[in-house]
Amino acid sequence: PDWRIEMRIKGEDIAAAYREIRGLSRKVEDPEYIRICFSQKASPGGYYWIFPKGENLVNVGLGVQMKEGFPNPKNMLYRSVLSKPSFLDSKVLEGGGGLVSTRRPMSNMVGNGILFVGDAAYQPNPVHGGGIGPSMVAGKLAAQAACRGIEDGDLSMESLWSYNVEFMKWYGAKAAGLDIFRIFLQKCSDDELNYGMANGLIKEEDLLKASLGEDLKLTVTEKARRFFRGLGRPSFLRALEKTAKNMKKMKSLYMRYPQPREFEVWLRQVNDIVREMEEMTF
C-alpha cells in the first residue's frame, strides 16, 4: 500500500561504526571531557571519539560514512586512534560494531496499523549517532497515538498521524537542522576544517551549538568580520552561510509538519533543501 513511507536509506546516510571499552595503563587525561574528532583522513565522512568511563577506562570508537568503497571502521580505529601513545599497553575489555543512521528522521513514520520507532525510523542524532533519548520519547509518543487509535477504533494512517506531528516538533526539527550540518561537515576536507577553525569561520561554539540543534546565528558584525577572514577561501564562507540558512529553513519546515493532505508538498520542499546541500561545492 501507498503509505508514503521511505523504505530505503542511502548508504551515504549510514555510518558503519566500531568501538571498544579499553582499560588504560595510565589515568585518563581530563576525565571530565569527552573528545570527538572530525577527520576525513582518520574517519572518512564520520568521526572518532574517546569517552572517559572511569579513571583508567574509556569508550573509544570510530565511524565512517558508508559510501561505495568505505573502509573497515575497526581497521581505521586501530590505525588512526589506538596507535596513539595514550593507548600503549591498553587492554580490550569489550568490543563491537554496527550500523547507525545519520540523517533526519523518516519523513513519515506511520501507516495503517503500524508505527516506526528508533533505528527503524532513523531517529539517532545525525551528527553523533546517539539515539537512546529520542527513541525513548518516540516510543512514548507512538504508544500514546496507538492508545488513542484503539480507544477510537481507528488505527488508520490518518488516526496515527499525531505521532508524526508531535515527534517532529519535539525532536525532528532539531534533527533535520543537524542533518544539514552533517552534510556540510562531510563535504569539508581536513584542510578546510582546520582553515575554518584557525580563521574563526567555524568556531568551537558554532560546532557545539549546531551539535545541540541550535541555529548557526551570524550577526551582521560577525558576518563582516568573518568575510574578511575568509577572503582566502570565499567559497568556503559562502558554503558556511548557505548551511546556516538551510539549517534554519529545515527546522522551520519541520516545526510546521503538515497533515496528510499537505504532506507531498511539504516533502518536496524538504527534498529540495537536501538536494541543494548535496550538490553544493566549495
Predicted regions mapped to residue ranges:
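FAD/FMN-dependent oxidoreductases across multiple families
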Residues: 68-142, 151, 157-170, 179, ...
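Charged, low-complexity, helix/coiled-coil-prone segments
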Residues: 13-28, 76-92, 104-111, 215-217, ...
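A general structural signal for short secondary-structure boundary/capping elements
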Residues: 31-41, 64-67, 82-86, 94-102, ...
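Solvent-exposed, flexible loop/coil residues
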Residues: 26, 38-42, 103-104, 113-114, ...
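Residues on a specific face of well-ordered alpha-helices
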Residues: 16, 20, 137-144
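Predominantly flavin-linked oxidoreductase catalytic cores and closely associated redox partners
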Residues: 1-89, 121-123
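C-terminal helical "tail/cap" subdomain of flavin- and related membrane-associated enzymes
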Residues: 147-282
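Short, Lys/Arg-enriched charge-dense amphipathic segments
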Residues: 28-37, 73-77, 109-122, 174-188, ...
